[in-house]
């Protein structure tokens, strides 16, 4: 059930995450320029705009969930459990949004360690929650979804308390949440939507394939799900570098340090290309073992198709890497039309 619908839930979650990282670019520019009033206002506006987007996606997702799942050709025997899983994930989008805004804001002011630690703790709690709710309480797929949302909720509380106590400059007031600055709103929406669509680009493509994949039987669904999970792990580095460079470039643009931006882009491109090469080597040497590790299946059809997916997919990672780095430059550019086109 999770495998047949994971692309849909990932699409929504990745869009929100990308959008929040786009908002944080404006915060990074304000921080680089040492304009703390605008920094607080950018955080307040990020929360308001993000919450509006999360509420719209939650309502729309819950209302149209059944038609979407049928459009994706989710097998009838998986439809009920798939509905339970995606419904909980969608219902928790506000929690997801709050974590994304807070962690992106911390990165925007140069604190990259805290979001990483909180994320690691959240992952451990998620795994522990899965074991408790699925293995002990026998809640099945519903338990997996609940564990995900609860672990994110804990991450939100930790981030909020840390941010409030550690950074007085980020203690927003009611006035900071008023959408009054037209220029800031325009830049935030342009950057946020651009980053949102970029972050969900792969999932948009995969979603179009899911309708056909779900018709090909259980083994192909398992193979595709396993390959996508491994591929997502491989591609985390591109997303991390893209988000980091967008924040880094925003800070240095605000501070007027253009040469540091050039140097950072070259280094990031080099590092991601090295990562691409390592992924290709991994796919062609131990790809089948990774598939077995993820699925626990020794079915030849599952192993062969998932490994083939990885071997073909990783060859094109260089293109993805360059796109993520270049877009980080475009997202800090002044012409908003260029951001939208990108």
Q: Residues of each region from the PLM?
A:
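Short alpha-helical transmembrane segments in multi-pass integral membrane proteins
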Residues: 27-92, 136-193, 249-316
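Structural signal for membrane-spanning alpha-helices in multi-pass inner-membrane proteins
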Residues: 61, 130, 159-163, 210, ...
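Alpha-helical transmembrane segments and their helix-entry boundary regions
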Residues: 112-116, 144-145, 221, 337
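Transmembrane helical elements of multi-pass membrane transporters/channels
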Residues: 88, 122, 151-155, 159, ...
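Helix-terminus/linker motif at the lipid-water interface of multi-pass membrane proteins
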Residues: 1, 69-76, 132-139, 200-229, ...
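Single conserved hydrophobic/aromatic residue that forms the stacking wall/gate
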Residues: 331-341
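Transmembrane alpha-helix boundary and packing residues in multipass membrane permease domains
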Residues: 25, 66-67, 104, 131, ...
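Small-residue-rich hydrophobic transmembrane alpha-helices
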Residues: 2-59, 96-115, 223-287, 320-333
């Amino acid at each position: 059930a999770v495998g047949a619908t994971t692309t849909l839930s990932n699409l929504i979650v990745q869009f929100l995450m990308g959008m929040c990282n786009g908002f944080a670019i404006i915060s990074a520019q304000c921080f680089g320029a040492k304009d703390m009033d605008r920094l607080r206002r950018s955080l307040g506006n990020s929360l308001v705009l993000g919450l509006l987007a999360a509420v719209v996606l939650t309502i729309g997702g819950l209302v149209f969930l059944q038609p979407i799942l049928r459009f994706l050709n989710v097998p009838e025997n998986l439809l009920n459990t798939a509905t339970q899983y995606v419904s909980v994930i969608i219902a928790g989008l506000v929690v997801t949004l709050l974590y994304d805004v807070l962690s992106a804001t911390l990165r925007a002011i140069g604190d990259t360690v805290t979001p990483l630690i909180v994320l690691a703790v959240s992952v451990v709690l998620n795994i522990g929650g899965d074991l408790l709710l699925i293995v002990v309480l026998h809640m099945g797929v519903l338990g997996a979804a609940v564990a995900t949302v609860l672990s994110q909720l804990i991450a939100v509380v930790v981030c909020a308390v840390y941010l409030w106590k550690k950074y007085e400059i980020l203690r927003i007031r009611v006035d900071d949440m008023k959408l009054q600055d037209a220029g800031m709103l325009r830049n935030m929406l342009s950057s946020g939507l651009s980053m949102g669509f970029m972050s969900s680009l792969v999932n948009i493509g995969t979603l179009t394939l899911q309708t056909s994949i779900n018709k090909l039987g259980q083994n192909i669904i398992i193979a595709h799900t396993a390959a996508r999970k491994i591929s997502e792990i491989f591609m985390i580095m591109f997303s991390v570098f893209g988000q980091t460079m967008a924040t880094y470039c925003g800070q240095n643009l605000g501070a007027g340090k253009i040469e540091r931006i050039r140097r950072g882009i070259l280094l990031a491109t080099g590092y991601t290309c090295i990562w691409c090469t390592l992924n290709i080597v991994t796919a062609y040497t131990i790809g089948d073992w990774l598939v077995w590790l993820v699925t626990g299946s020794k079915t030849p059809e599952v192993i062969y198709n998932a490994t083939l997916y990885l071997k073909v997919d990783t060859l094109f990672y260089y293109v993805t890497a360059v796109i993520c780095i270049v877009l980080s430059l475009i997202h800090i550019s002044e012409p908003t039309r260029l951001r939208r086109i990108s």
